[in-house]
């Protein structure tokens, strides 16, 4: 008799995705982040669901409802901080996952890569709208500043902004719709994750060497399930340490002040995971140019597969490309730092140089170094 996991209509889908899935034998810990992202998404949906049971999306009561969750609801404080810091963990895993894809040339699987970019945009939109919900000072002004960027779109910009706001300023209508979308988007993300996996399982996983691994495959379970559980334990240790010892470490103190349209905070800035894009936005003195650069800072990933000039897929045996990759990582750290600094000398010029370097590395230097390495290897 066939094992039920191989014959049952539902279980056999799970079996072919999680148990008997053939995986390359040489996958490193950099391949852990896919499963960690899945766990992050599930945790965010779960904690978010329980928070939504006590939250009210009204400008008069939103701030107080979050306070009520933390003070009066059983374990409400841990739910709130798990959700807030879980988002930070989500983005850490996301950026490492994308970085792994860039380093090992996984972007050559274009369908999987493009769905991944759509997922990245969806998660960023969800996180932005979630940041508005506590209705603190940074929530209100963050929402005002970021949505106002759309007014830079020629002809329809102003109407578009007022349409999103549901009025002439960020107010009750804005908060209500942001809550609705913040609740809805994670389920859309879950559906996109299924499509992401569907495309991935069409081609099979990449591996660190970037060479076909059809001859040397091992079952996903028990080898990679055990490896993923170790990754999960490390992430849970980091998350629980953050939540239990310094839950507000990554947040902004201004968000503990209720939203006040008459009082602007001295430095309006988003959560840390958007600071690199915010720095790129601020480095261009023109509004429309800044908005385009902001969108392109993520959208540039979509043209990376077209700019792959090397005859090797992975960077594992390409030391010059490796140097460039780590320069890009250092540049992103610099942009993140600059995004949190006030707009004054020398931060402005550092931000502009870092922004130019960011686009130069991806669009110019990496393809050129790829060609150069081919010549060095006489290919």
Swiss-Prot record:
Query: Which SUPFAM superfamilies does the record match to this protein?
Result: a domain/subunit of cytochrome bc1 complex (Ubiquinol-cytochrome c reductase) (SSF81648), Transmembrane di-heme cytochromes (SSF81342)
Ligand binding (heme b b562): 83, 182
According to Swiss-Prot or TrEMBL, what is its membrane topology? Multi-pass membrane protein
Q: Where does a ubiquinone bind?
A: 201
Which note does the record give on the cofactor? Binds 2 heme b groups non-covalently.
Q: Which GO terms describe its biological process?
A: mitochondrial electron transport, ubiquinol to cytochrome c
Give the CC-aspect GO terms: mitochondrial inner membrane; respiratory chain complex III
The record's listing under Pfam families reads: Cytochrom_B_C, Cytochrome_B
Q: How does it assemble?
A: The cytochrome bc1 complex contains 11 subunits: 3 respiratory subunits (MT-CYB, CYC1 and UQCRFS1), 2 core proteins (UQCRC1 and UQCRC2) and 6 low-molecular weight proteins (UQCRH/QCR6, UQCRB/QCR7, UQCRQ/QCR8, UQCR10/QCR9, UQCR11/QCR10 and a cleavage product of UQCRFS1). This cytochrome bc1 complex then forms a dimer.
Q: What else is known?
A: Heme 1 (or BL or b562) is low-potential and absorbs at about 562 nm, and heme 2 (or BH or b566) is high-potential and absorbs at about 566 nm.
General function of this protein:
Component of the ubiquinol-cytochrome c reductase complex (complex III or cytochrome b-c1 complex) that is part of the mitochondrial respiratory chain. The b-c1 complex mediates electron transfer from ubiquinol to cytochrome c. Contributes to the generation of a proton gradient across the mitochondrial membrane that is then used for ATP synthesis.
The entry sums up its family as follows:
Belongs to the cytochrome b family.
Query: What is the protein's given name?
Result: Cytochrome b
This chain's source organism reads Micronycteris homezi (Big-eared bat)
